[in-house]
C-alpha cells in the first residue's frame, strides 16, 4: 500500500518525467486501476494533420491539475467533437469512445484507467482529414490487446508513417500525411 503523499511535491521532484518524449508516468498500477500523470505538450502531431484515435473498451477518468487540455472524440461514430477540460475540471470518458488527448505546453493531468480484461481489445484508428466526408471515415484500424500502451503504439504508428498505401482513404482516395 502506498502511503499518502503530497502530489505537488511529487510533481516538483519528477517534472522531467512529464515532458516530451516521455510525457507520462505511471503513478499507481493496482489490480483494477492504473493512475498516470501526464504532461504536455504532446510530442506527436496527431491532432493537426492526421486524426488518430485510441478506442479503449473501458472508461477513462481525466482530471486536469494544471492548465487546460483538449480531448478530441468521435461521438456516436458520426461526429468529431472537441471537449475542453479546464484546470481543476474532471471528465469521465465512456468506454468504446474513440479519443485523442491534446495536451499543451506546461500542463499536467491525471488519467485513471481500468486494467484491461484479458479478452479486451483496444483499437488504434486513423481517420481521413482530407476528404469531404459526411461522417468520420476510418482509413486504417489496428486491433490489439493492450498490455503496455507505451511500447505497443510505437511500432503501429511507425508502420503507418512508412507505408503510404496504408494511409490511402478507401472512400475518397486521398493519402493522409504520415504525421
UniProtKB/Swiss-Prot annotation:
Under the heading Pfam families, the entry gives:
3-HAO
Q: Name the EC number(s).
A: 1.13.11.6
Q: Show the GO cellular component annotation of the record.
A: cytoplasm
The prosthetic group or cofactor this protein requires is: Fe(2+)
Q: Which InterPro entries does this one have?
A: 3hydroanth_dOase (IPR010329), RmlC-like_jellyroll (IPR014710), RmlC_Cupin_sf (IPR011051)
> GO molecular function of the protein, one example?
3-hydroxyanthranilate 3,4-dioxygenase activity
In the UniProt record, does the keyword Phosphoprotein occur?
Answer: no
Compartments, record wording: Cytoplasm
Tree of life domain? Eukaryota
Write out the GO biological process terms: 'de novo' NAD biosynthetic process from L-tryptophan; anthranilate metabolic process; L-tryptophan catabolic process; quinolinate biosynthetic process
Q: Where does Fe cation bind?
A: 48, 60, 99
Which reaction(s) does its UniProt entry say it catalyses? Answer: 3-hydroxyanthranilate + O2 = (2Z,4Z)-2-amino-3-carboxymuconate 6-semialdehyde
Residue sites binding O2 per the record: 44
Keywords from the named record: Cytoplasm, Dioxygenase, Iron, Metal-binding, Oxidoreductase, Pyridine nucleotide biosynthesis
Pathway named in the protein's UniProt entry: Cofactor biosynthesis; NAD(+) biosynthesis; quinolinate from L-kynurenine: step 3/3
Main location class = cytoplasm
Q: Where does substrate bind?
A: 60, 103, 113
**NCBIfam families this protein is in?**
anthran_nbaC
Q: What family, per the record?
A: Belongs to the 3-HAO family.
Q: What HAMAP family does the entry give?
A: 3_HAO
Q: Which PANTHER family match?
A: 3-HYDROXYANTHRANILATE 3,4-DIOXYGENASE, 3-HYDROXYANTHRANILATE 3,4-DIOXYGENASE 2
Q: What does this protein do?
A: Catalyzes the oxidative ring opening of 3-hydroxyanthranilate to 2-amino-3-carboxymuconate semialdehyde, which spontaneously cyclizes to quinolinate.
Q: What is this protein called?
A: 3-hydroxyanthranilate 3,4-dioxygenase 2
Q: Which organism is it from?
A: Aspergillus oryzae (strain ATCC 42149 / RIB 40)
The UniProt gene name for this protein comes to bna1-2
Amino acid at each position: 500500500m502506498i502511503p499518502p503523499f503530497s502530489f505537488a511535491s511529487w510533481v516538483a521532484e519528477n517534472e522531467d518525467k512529464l515532458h516530451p518524449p516521455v510525457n507520462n508516468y505511471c503513478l499507481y498500477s493496482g489490480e483494477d486501476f492504473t493512475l498516470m500523470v501526464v504532461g504536455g505538450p504532446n510530442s506527436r502531431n496527431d491532432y493537426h494533420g492526421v486524426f488518430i484515435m485510441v478506442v479503449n473498451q473501458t472508461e477513462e477518468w481525466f482530471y486536469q491539475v494544471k492548465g487546460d487540455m483538449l480531448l478530441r472524440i468521435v461521438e456516436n461514430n458520426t461526429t468529431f467533437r472537441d471537449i475542453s477540460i479546464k484546470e481543476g475540471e474532471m471528465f469521465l470518458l465512456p468506454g468504446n469512445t474513440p479519443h485523442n488527448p491534446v495536451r499543451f505546453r506546461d500542463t499536467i493531468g491525471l488519467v485513471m484507467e481500468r486494467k484491461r480484461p484479458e479478452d479486451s481489445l483496444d483499437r488504434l484508428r486513423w481517420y481521413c482529414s482530407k476528404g469531404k466526408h459526411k461522417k468520420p471515415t476510418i482509413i486504417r484500424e489496428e486491433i490489439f490487446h493492450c498490455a503496455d500502451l507505451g511500447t505497443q503504439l510505437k511500432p503501429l504508428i511507425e508502420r503507418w508513417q512508412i507505408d503510404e498505401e496504408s494511409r490511402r482513404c478507401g472512400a475518397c482516395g486521398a493519402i493522409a500525411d504520415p504525421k
